[in-house]
Swiss-Prot record:
GO CC aspect terms: cytoplasm
The organism's place on the tree of life at top rank: Bacteria
Pfam families hit by this protein: HSP33
Protein species of origin: Haemophilus influenzae (strain 86-028NP)
Post-translational modification: Under oxidizing conditions two disulfide bonds are formed involving the reactive cysteines. Under reducing conditions zinc is bound to the reactive cysteines and the protein is inactive.
Similarity section: Belongs to the HSP33 family.
CDD domains named among the record's database cross-references: Hsp33
UniProt name for this protein: 33 kDa chaperonin
Keyword Repressor: no
GO biological process: protein refolding
One MF annotation (Gene Ontology) recorded for this entry: protein folding chaperone
Main subcellular location: cytoplasm
Function field: Redox regulated molecular chaperone. Protects both thermally unfolding and oxidatively damaged proteins from irreversible aggregation. Plays an important role in the bacterial defense system toward oxidative stress.
Disulfide-bond pairs as recorded: 237-239, 271-274
């Protein structure tokens, strides 16, 4: 059995790998503290926690395919009790997530019952250049299957996603793998099918509890796999007092004064993503107003 020191060395890491004799590329990611930090800010129902974990892993795997600096947003909108689930991640593997719930969500509620009539939207935003947005119908039982379909339709590349959420040693964990035929056309369907068949045998405890190198050896011990250095993954919200101040400046002085009157002379702004509070008293508000152009 792998000891704790061994398995934790790859907590909150993303790896890329290539098969030396088959034109297929792969990625592996595991979210431990990153996932826990996300869940600690809200009391989400269990089914929503699992969905966010699945979306976070998918977003990490998607951003790892970017060939440029930028970010990807994976967003679900619907008219069911889960109104919104949103994950944003960038090429530095900094990620954040949030959900909005309006209604009762049971532990084993299906994706379709949670969302109702809804869509999955993927937005790719390079730091330089135009944004790309794809809208995907939620016509599959899981987000993972919907995203596999997205890859086939948008990139015309055979892609396998394996994503699992759960607990390991009593703590929340989300992990996943991506296999994709190389875009240069050198890969064969037979090679891809062979590797995906092996990947499909992976067990939850292996994804959650093994270092990447050992996991890949167990799955592909007859293959030559080139494993590249890991990239750290972390929860990163990006909120700040400055951004909260800018948000306040978007409303009129009259509206600000009304809010101050209703809240006994101060405004408490809470970040929806990480839960951080930003307090503005009357003096700070007056100073802020004076900066208006």
């Amino acid at each position: 059995m792998t000891n704790q020191q061994d398995y934790t060395q790859d907590n909150d890491k993303l790896y890329r790998y290539l098969f030396q004799h088959r034109a297929v590329r792969g990625e592996w990611v595991r979210l431990n503290k990153t996932f826990t930090d996300t869940l600690n800010t809200h009391q989400y129902p269990k089914a929503v926690q699992d969905l966010l974990g699945e979306m976070m892993v998918a977003t990490n795997l998607l951003t790892a395919t970017l060939k440029f600096a930028g970010n990807i947003t994976v967003q679900i909108q619907g008219d069911g009790p889960l109104r919104l689930a949103l994950v944003n991640g960038n090429d530095q593997q900094q990620i954040r997530a949030l959900a909005r719930v309006d209604g009762n969500i049971t532990e084993n509620m299906s994706l379709h019952n949670m969302i109702g009539k809804g869509v999955l939207v993927i937005t790719i935003a390079p730091k330089e250049g135009e944004r790309y947005q794809g809208v995907i119908s939620l016509d599959k039982p899981t987000i993972t299957e919907c995203l596999e379909d997205y890859f086939v339709r948008s990139e015309q590349l055979q892609t396998q996603l394996i994503i699992r959420t759960g607990e390991y040693e009593g703590k929340p964990v989300a992990a996943g793998m991506l296999l994709q035929i190389m875009p240069d056309g050198s890969g064969t369907p037979e090679d891809f099918e062979h590797l995906t068949t092996l990947a499909a045998t992976v067990k939850d405890e292996e994804l959650f509890g093994l270092p990447a190198e050992e996991l890949l050896y167990r799955l592909y011990h007859e293959e030559t796999v080139n494993l590249y250095p890991a990239q750290d993954v972390q929860f990163f919200c990006g909120c700040s007092a400055e951004r909260s101040s800018s948000a306040l400046l978007l409303i009129s002085d009259e509206e600000i004064d009304e809010i101050l009157a209703e809240h006994k002379g101060s405004i408490d702004m809470q970040c929806e993503c990480c839960g951080t509070h930003y307090f503005f008293n009357k003096e700070a508000i007056e100073k802020l107003k004076s900066t208006r152009v």
